Design a protein with these regions (language model features):
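Low-complexity or membrane-interfacial segments used for flexible interactions
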Residues: 1-46, 82-87, 98-99, 104-271
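A glycine-rich, hydrophobic loop/mini-helix early in the fold
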Residues: 44-93
């Protein structure tokens, strides 16, 4: 199953839509205003996740004390072999339903943890060229993959979530996790943008690089699904390249106008001063 998590607004507020086969499934919102407070207190602001009618399904609660204690010792994981960062509790209609956090087990060994329904799913993030991937595991079995193109226009990120049908029940949590992931890793809070584009190539190296299987989507969903994803990614890159060329032309035109104005001003001043 393919689920798309598309950021629809990045100015003044961060809004997302979660859809599948053209049907809106959920909406989400993340904090926008950039605030720097002691002990990361700005993270006390909630991420929200709602159904199409706007009814809240989940919110987050920043585990302030737990994070303060856990993160107070730099490189604690070198001694304890495990240290949690960015712990957010998932709050549902019936109270706490799980948590999101990063587990650091070594200098080159980190993973995202998704606690829900009494289980812990692990997400391994990897930059490889023009895309970022998060491979989601249930134990030793891969159950999902999140693909994010690193070409972004106007800070509007998009994520493609492929998930095995037997895990469809956790689509809401994984979709909400994707918004949390964006907030933790690709957050552009406080930035006002228009007609901008970012085109990146990036590679990350770590102990868990082998968790990414480039053939997983084709194996689980068929070659057509893999080809369709590649087409979507190529389209995004093409749109980004076109936008970049447009921006270059506009900047060049602006400089040309400034040069012409400077020449005119010089001629006027010269004639005036004799």
């Amino acid at each position: 199953m393919l689920v798309t998590i598309q950021q629809t607004k990045s100015n003044i507020e961060n809004l997302f839509e979660v859809s599948s086969n053209g049907q809106l499934l959920f909406q989400a919102k993340a904090p926008w205003m950039k605030i720097s407070l002691p002990f990361n207190a700005e993270d006390l602001r909630e991420l929200t996740f709602s159904n199409p009618a706007g009814e809240i399904v989940y919110t987050t609660r920043y585990k302030f004390i737990d994070n303060l204690v856990e993160e107070s010792i730099p490189f604690k994981y070198l001694l304890t072999k495990g240290q949690r960062f960015g712990q957010f509790e998932i709050i549902g209609r019936n109270g706490s339903e799980g948590a999101f956090y990063v587990m650091q087990n070594g200098l080159f060994d980190s993973k995202f943890c998704i606690e829900c329904s009494g289980k812990v799913y692990l997400g391994y993030s990897l930059d490889k060229g023009r895309n970022n991937y998060v491979s989601i595991y249930d134990g030793v079995k891969q159950i999902a993959q999140i693909t994010k193109p690193l070409t972004v226009t106007d800070n509007l990120d998009v994520y493609f979530l492929h998930i095995k049908d037997e895990y469809a029940s956790i689509i809401p949590v994984l979709s909400f996790f994707t918004v949390y992931y964006d907030y933790q890793k690709y957050n552009h809070s406080g930035e006002l943008t228009k007609n901008t584009v970012q085109i990146s190539n990036s590679y990350t190296y770590g102990k868990n690089n082998d968790k990414y299987n480039p053939n997983w989507i084709a194996k689980e969903f068929g070659q057509q699904a893999a080809d369709e994803l590649e087409q979507k990614l190529r389209k995004i890159r093409a749109q980004g390249s076109a936008q970049a060329k447009k921006i270059v032309k506009l900047v060049g035109l602006a400089y040309l106008v400034l040069i012409l104005l400077a020449i005119v001003l010089f001629v006027v001043l010269k004639s005036t001063l004799g």
